[in-house]
């Protein structure tokens, strides 16, 4: 199945046609798709109305520099701010992370959007793309935050997506623009980067997003193209039973599988349930690529339509209103 990107704040005729395709499971929204709270709710409704089957509508609303919906939404802190507090006040830091998750999820759901791809559970060890998106460089600290964040998302009615498996934080390269390779063996990864993923899976995480990083001592392909990582380690060894998302096939580190069709097939063949096609110019070719494939159409049902509050419902919710006052609102 595919999660696709659309170009603007309203659906075009071509995009409505795409949503009719059996392989399209939903839409990923970006800054380019956002103008206001009202508009994004209308866009979400239009996406659902255009498709003959339920659609999963997603966004990256992590906080800090990765927050696609801004004006009219709470200013969410980057996750690293909670990690910094943990050294002096661990319980307070975990409580703030739970509040962050609850507020983010409530506002996203109020907009008619099902899922924010969160939390980032990579280690904060110098990666250019991750940076302050990660809680900490300590695996056990990140594991504690991961458990708390997953539980808070569930309490707010949203699924949890752990990213970027099996850990993107230690390589320096940004896989949006470059290839990345992590030379460490599996036993080291299990003792370090994979610790938060294990904690999140144990806490009931609903989904995992793969990294476009190569770990050559484990598999020769980027993790999202490697059945060794997805089928043997994630599902087999770690016992994960949820949804596996690829990362975006428009990123430079994904190009090792060849053209658009090659990337789509490589992810699906490796065991990904859903391939992210975030660039609209890649959607038509991706749809051609999946023609004739058997698709796991039931995989996303548990993430779709958990019941949007609407903004009236959100504002009437006293705990969420007090959280918003604590974090502040973007004008």
Swiss-Prot record:
Disulfide bonds: none annotated. Pathway: Cell wall biogenesis; peptidoglycan recycling. Gene3D superfamilies: Glycoside hydrolase, family 3, N-terminal domain. One of its GO terms (molecular function) is beta-N-acetylglucosaminidase activity. It is found in: Cytoplasm. InterPro entries: Beta_hexosaminidase_bac, Glyco_hydro_3_AS, Glyco_hydro_3_N, Glyco_hydro_3_N_sf, Glycoside_hydrolase_SF, NagZ_Beta-hexosaminidase. Keywords: Cell cycle, Cell division, Cell shape, Cell wall biogenesis/degradation, Cytoplasm, Glycosidase, Hydrolase, Peptidoglycan synthesis. One of its GO terms (biological process) is carbohydrate metabolic process. Substrate binds at residues 60, 68, 133, 163-164. GO terms for cellular component: cytosol. Belongs to the glycosyl hydrolase 3 family. NagZ subfamily. Plays a role in peptidoglycan recycling by cleaving the terminal beta-1,4-linked N-acetylglucosamine (GlcNAc) from peptide-linked peptidoglycan fragments, giving rise to free GlcNAc, anhydro-N-acetylmuramic acid and anhydro-N-acetylmuramic acid-linked peptides. This is Beta-hexosaminidase. It comes from Xanthomonas campestris pv. campestris (strain ATCC 33913 / DSM 3586 / NCPPB 528 / LMG 568 / P 25).
